Amino acid sequence: MAIKKIKKDDTVIVITGRDKGRQGKVLKVLPNSRLLVEGINLVKKHVKPNPNKNEQGGILERELSIHVSNVAIYNPAAKKADRVGIKTLEDGSKVRIFKSNGEVIDV
């Protein structure tokens, strides 16, 4: 199975688009190379009231997905966006590393 470069709970920075420069936590990774990021790509959705589900109508603000190519993972050591590489350890397991300093992201 291929290892994903960005996973749930990673902190990412938007590198292009309307929210450029903002950072947030990945809430969900969608199968079509898209991400839901907390506080990024917010839209207002108008919702009708639904008494069957006890839902109140109004204007809701929610996140839409953003393509994975529009974000970069946040490197806390360098305090900036970084690229992700994949390194195979001696025991055969693969880990994600930061390209700038070679530091392991997760074990």
From Swiss-Prot:
The UniProt record lists the keyword Translocase: no
Domain of life: Bacteria
Bilayer-crossing regions: none
Record-linked InterPro entries: KOW, Rib_uL2_dom2, Ribosomal_uL24, Ribosomal_uL24_CS, Ribosomal_uL24_KOW, Translation_prot_SH3-like_sf
Family according to the record: Belongs to the universal ribosomal protein uL24 family.
Function (record text): One of two assembly initiator proteins, it binds directly to the 5'-end of the 23S rRNA, where it nucleates assembly of the 50S subunit.
Protein's UniProt name: Large ribosomal subunit protein uL24
Organism: Coxiella burnetii (strain Dugway 5J108-111)
Gene name of the record: rplX
